[in-house]
Structure formats: structure tokens, C-alpha cells
């Protein structure tokens, strides 16, 4: 018993990222040598993801309401420049995916049609879903994790509470601090969660099923890596005018790794919020930009939609000119921004992009089925890019406007 405090002190001294890497390796080894036991510990991963998903809507609602209610007059926030960066990043990702697909054309072995999913009818349907999400019932929005609706209600209440008594605003601030503390406790269990997620995933499917789609995966993941390590740093350099890579690697390490294994931008919101706090960013800014980014900053989704669509086009022998490729980039960027408003995310928006080339819905749904097969890697890499970019662009904008703690700025 006397060794327990020493063990806990050692765990507290060890960085969370190091603990997550240990959990990752342990999960892979367990799945390799004891697949039966690995399936059992998958429960740890499911519990961790569920805990993050449970706390994220409440965190966003309370934090945004508190930030706006307690906002001091004359204190600037920089949401608009961050939204511009989100749009620029998503459009750049679509363009990178088009270029990668032209340089490394890919063909698909189409599988049986995925009949249990229904894609949206068009871009109008996606926008319609987003608009109705804004005016959703607040209780239903919290229960279903509708972050567009949560943001709308939190912003409205935040502005309304600016006229409340000081004691009311302090209560909201205390509630925000309490929820933040709960989030920190949940995140401390990330190593166990990653251990369970890796062990369960490898024990269930392994990577044998992915070998047949190795070239497609290389193009997908390669485009995402190029976006994360080349394009995003260029955008950040344009903002902060100095070496962007320390900040880029911090965001990939602290946010991207967790997002890769949770495979949920919503579940990674608490992780991103805590990282923004450690980076010394302005709370009024990141409390809005991070949940907003989880909804509209979808560079990874734009890459997935574009690469799989052009793979289908190449498989069917359809010729693509430059003008159509540019149009596809724009369509993929718009579709990607609506990915969070569609059940199934980016994969179910592929038929929209395929319709640009006259590909029938039956064939497009076969492409979606291929996407589900490679989803273990595709969805993980996509979420890691999406979520880490939320923090990256928020931090870049704050640094560019001098809205960051100086000590934190020296660390990045």
C-alpha cells in the first residue's frame, strides 16, 4: 500500500503524451499476442470515448455562455480571422487532394452496395440540415451533441447574461470552472482509453483487410500528411511570420494523437480546450473557435471526399479537365463544412461529389462502402488533421494579434 502514493506521483510527473504512447504500444502488443484478452479491454476505449462525448456538449455550452457573459467591454476577440483560416485550410486541403489524385491516380475494386445508409440529396440538403441544427431545441441539442445548436444557444444566452447581476455571472463562471475540472479528470484517463481502443480495433479487424486498398490509403494519408506538415505550416507562417513548426508539432502531438484514436472531433473538444489553456490563448476566443472548428473546419473531410470521388472517376474512365477539378475542390470544401451535420460524416457526402461527374447513386454508394472498409485508418487520420488544425489556427490567430500569454508564447 505504501508504494501507491509513489506510483501516483510518478504518473503525475510523466507527461500525458508519453503515457498515451505507452498505452498505444501496450494495446498493439496485447492484440498481437492475446487477441481474446484485447477484445475484452476494448471496453476501456469505449468508456473513454463515451465519457468525452458526454462531457463535450456540456463543456461547450457552459464555457461559451460563461465567456460571453463575463466578457469585458473593449476586450477584443479574433473569431472572424480564425473562421477565414478555417475556410482557407479546408479549401487548400481539397486542392491538395485533387493534385495528389492527379499525380497518383487510384482505381477501386467496387464492393457490394451499402444499402443501410442514406446520403443527402444535394448541397441544399446539407445546408438545410445545418440551418435546422442552428434552431434546434437546446435540450435536444445537448442530448444529441448538436454543436451548431449548442453554440447558437450558448452565444444567445451569453449575450443575454451580460445584463444579469454580478452574482449570476460569477455563478456561471464557477459552473464553467467545475465542468473544466471534470474534463481534466476525464482526460487523465486517456492512456487507458487509447490502450483499449488500439487493442480492440486491432483484435477485431487487424490490418489484413486494408492491404487491398494500400495505394488508396497511401494517397489519402499522404495528402493529409502534406496538409499537416506543409500547407498548414505555410498558413501559420503567413499569420505569425516566424518558424511555425514548434506550434505545428505541439498541436499534432497534444491534440492529433488523441483525436486519431478517439476518431471524433466532438470527443476531442475537451482535449483541445485544455491545450489552448496551456498555450495561454484568450479564453473568450478559444471557447468559441474550438467547438466551431469541430463543426466547420474539415480539411480532412475535404481530402476524403475528393480522393475517393476522383478514384471512382478514374475507375470508370471519366476524363476530368482543370475547370471541373477546380469546381470539385469548391464543392468538396462546401460539403466538408457540412460533414458534421450529416450522419456518417464525410463518407456519405461522396455521392454529392460523384454527382458532379454523372456517377449514379448506386455506384457512388459502392465507393462509400469502400470508405467504410478503410475507415479504421481514413477516419482516424481525418479526425487527427481536423481536430489538431482547430487548435493550430486558433493559436496562430491569437499569436498574430498578440492575444497570448508571453510565457506560453515562448514555450511554442
Swiss-Prot record:
Tell me the superkingdom of the source: Bacteria
Give compartment(s): Cell inner membrane
| Record's bilayer topology term | Multi-pass membrane protein
Which reaction does this chain catalyze? Answer: L-serine(in) + Na(+)(in) = L-serine(out) + Na(+)(out); L-threonine(in) + Na(+)(in) = L-threonine(out) + Na(+)(out)
InterPro entries, sorted: Na-dicarboxylate_symporter, Na:dicarbo_symporter_sf, Ser_Thr_transp_SstT
Identify one Gene Ontology CC term for this UniProt entry.
Answer: plasma membrane
Q: Which family does this protein fall into?
A: Belongs to the dicarboxylate/amino acid:cation symporter (DAACS) (TC 2.A.23) family.
Chain's role: Involved in the import of serine and threonine into the cell, with the concomitant import of sodium (symport system).
Q: What is this protein called?
A: Serine/threonine transporter SstT
Q: Which organism is it from?
A: Stutzerimonas stutzeri (strain A1501) (Pseudomonas stutzeri)
